[in-house]
Amino acid sequence: MKSVGLITEYNPFHNGHQYHINQSKKLTNADVTIAIMSGNFVMRGEPAIYNKFTRAKMALSTADLVIELPATASLSSGDHFAELAVKVADYMSVDTIAFGSENNDIKTLKQLAHSINEIEQSESFSQKVKEGKSYPRIISELLEHHEALASPNNILGISYLKAIAKHAKNINAISIKRENAQHHDSLIQHHQFASGTSIRTSIISQDDHWHHVVPKDIQHLYVTPHITLNQIFPYLKYQIIAMTTESLKNIYTVNEGFENRLKSTINEATDFHHFVKSLKTKRYTYTHIQRLLMNVLLNIKPTDVTRNIRAVKVLAMNDRGRQYLKHLKTAFPERQYITNINKSNAHYFTNEIKATHIYNAISGQQQTDFNTPVIQQYR
């Protein structure tokens, strides 16, 4: 069976995602579409608006198979996110990865990926790091502010291409042009497509605009948000106050004395956004800081970070997805394709299980990795 993989977060699923899946399948003539999706915490450095089980059910309206991306991938840099996602795709024997981009010029993106790999080894790069500049700014400066680097999906696409070249040369890549909505649009401005940001804003504010930009047959799944950043902040504040400076120093992505900055600013912080602003420096982007804070919340240490794929968790599948999974289990009997977590296989998913428990403790949701069987229908 020919397969196409999509690296996703679906926070939440919307018409743009449905378009992406359908176009990917059309352009590759794939028999099966595999969504590799972030779990309960996403790359923005925040909890997903709906838990991973609800979002997997949404995705099953169009995709055939939904696989959970390791939790630490979403709480890392774009490059590490891409590396782990590509490794999952390789584990799933994906033929082609299809990603969305603003310019839809795969040749240019591949050239930029090659150039960035070379730049990262240069003295100029090392010098700019010492100057305290952020990674995105350094790359932009050394590539003379190439226009493709101004778009977030282009940048992530470049990370996928770098990871494919390094870890999975057997996987092809194609780009699907994003339609209409811009990544960071805060309001719904189009009758069919909208950004995830604007849809979350619409859902949280309880207006009806989001109804126009998500598939009609799954709108029953878009209930009151499971969790918001405002709910998380008291738990995060408690964690930072309770932890010693030395303990904070041992959290993944906390370095260069940032633990002292956390300690010195937390008592005056009144909410999550105020706290993030008080932590901002020229070296770190807001998104990096938010991911760092989620690592603190989840108590993720460098030794907890997933580097290689030993098993994958299947969140959802339809009949076609089940057929493909059966094929994989026959072709690769040594690999672990887990549909239900139990005591014998839980050690593969320690971070994901912990992230779900903490998400539930704050949100009041009841679905866990142990009591939720693989999702097989979305209606």
From Swiss-Prot:
It comes from the Bacteria. The keyword Ligase applies. Its EC number is 6.3.4.-. Coiled coil: none annotated. Disulfide bonds: none annotated. NCBIfam families: PRK13670.1. Belongs to the TmcAL family. This is tRNA(Met) cytidine acetate ligase. The lineage of its organism: Bacteria, Bacillati, Bacillota, Bacilli, Bacillales. The gene is tmcAL.
